[in-house]
Amino acid sequence: MSRIGKKILEIPAGVTITVAEDNTVTVKGPKGELTRTFNADMLIKIEENTLTVERPSEQKEHRALHGTTRALIGNMVEGVTEGFARGLELVGVGYRAQKQGDKLVLSVGYSHPVEMTPEAGLEVEVPAPTKIVIKGIDKQRVGEFAANIRAVRAPEPYKGKGIRYEGEVVRRKEGKTAK
């Protein structure tokens, strides 16, 4: 039995959730609105200020979707109330980030600066030249944009230079040893 799927989701004050006929869930809150369509087999019920997700059978596919559906709706509720943020650090001599208008410009050792434009709904902050913070209400889009930034110059294992997530531990390798 899915423990996450069985958990009842408390709907906080100021958040409204609507479920359409085709299992499209719309969550409105103080920070914005998110909409997502879920598998038609899952039963999403709203009673007063709680939401429950039920599965029709014990088939492997339904068991897998049960917890996933509950977790995704939980993330939608958290996004419209608190929002999500993902931090990145730039490690390396001369590695810098700066914001020019709505673009993020990265100087990470290439012959040219790398320009990235966040999609609508995402906010990029550069509190320091070596720190980047991505904020938004959709957890998946925040994480995806952070991963795209990290992929520009992923941390290398010898010196640890590159763009890493805040708090990420880069596994280091030893260099060659002389004979």
Curated annotation (Swiss-Prot):
Keyword Ribonucleoprotein: yes
GO MF, one annotated term: rRNA binding
Gene Ontology annotations of biological process type: cytoplasmic translation
GO cellular component terms attached to this protein's record: cytosolic large ribosomal subunit
Listed InterPro entries: Ribosomal_uL6-like, Ribosomal_uL6-like_a/b-dom_sf, Ribosomal_uL6_a/b-dom, Ribosomal_uL6_bac-type, Ribosomal_uL6_CS
SUPFAM superfamilies given in the database record: Ribosomal protein L6 (SSF56053)
Ribonucleoprotein in keyword set: yes
Function: This protein binds to the 23S rRNA, and is important in its secondary structure. It is located near the subunit interface in the base of the L7/L12 stalk, and near the tRNA binding site of the peptidyltransferase center.
Name of this chain's protein: Large ribosomal subunit protein uL6
